[in-house]
Amino acid sequence: MSQNQVLFTPFQVGALTLPNRLVLAPMTRSRANNEGNVPTDSTVKYYVQRASAGLLITEGSQISQQGVGYIYTPGIYSEAQVAGWKKVTDAVHAAGGRIFIQLWHVGAISHPFFQNGELPVAPSAIKPVGVKAFTANGMEEIPTPRALATEEVKATVEDFRKAAENAKKAGFDGVEIHGANGYLVDQFIQDSTNQRTDEYGGSVENRARFALEVVQAAVDVLGADRVGIRLSPTGNVGGIHDSNRLATFSYVTEQFNKFGLAYLHVIEALPGHPMAAKAGQEPVGPALRKIFTGPFILNGGYTQETAEHALNNNEADLIAFGVPYIANPDLVERYQQGASLNTPDQATFYGGDDHGYIDYPSLQEQGAEAEVKQDIVQY
């Protein structure tokens, strides 16, 4: 087989056989119903349009009201949300697709607006830097959070368990734990945001405990072959960092191996991308690839060419695409046919109506439009 066709070959991920190696990366689009953070009919269409991907991973979906940090983002903790997501999964499956939901708790990156006037929670009372909260009042300053009590940490693990149960009820093929981008799970793992002195802080073994308990909770509900986790070892959202990223994330990954997870999803972008390792910062992804014994997904600024290169060099088993999928719902077909890509409209990435969400044309639609124009010219 030609090396430039690896993207379109099947691959086994946990309980699922994927028809290709393209993954829809989880992307917040802020289009949920603000009355209850419920997915809408437009959400259904958005994911169905992209169902030809090997695997769809939904936007981050909060496991509880406490986990909310942005307006118009969906949850998976209420009956209405479960019902809304069930419409999505039914439609995606009818279209031949496969879909995981990303389970999300923002931790410190929130605002009292979402917390009934209370402070956001975090492993430690450390204020995120360089980020603001997106509320109904616009972008607002994030306050210093309060540290979760030990019993509250354990209760949050149970919130993740309940979210996994709800995901199962909603018909998802599996769940991805959001352990990246400076949110709660990441805040526990890294020592800049975790200065606890109980069983969840201090040593790397203790700092990893919350993440491992969350994974175990999801595995208990769904089975390990339907649970993945996402990490961003070189990310710095909110100023997050670790004194020894390589050692910390290597340890965490070694522990993940004990579960037999569906996959490990790592954000470590290519040079020049905002999420790439910074100058003087060694990439961690290659080390995690060597450690992890299951399917490995890479994400961060990949094109068809760089994705094929990564797959052929065994840097990953699958590649997750974000921005290209926003404007190109039929990205698989466009790559297969060597077709040009639609240009995404950054002004419509977050919030708004269906414009910039579900109105990007597919190749088929563009072809039909071209035929109509040709008819007009001829007649």
Identify the residue ranges that each predicted region occupies:
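Flavin-dependent oxidoreductase catalytic cores
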Residues: 1-379
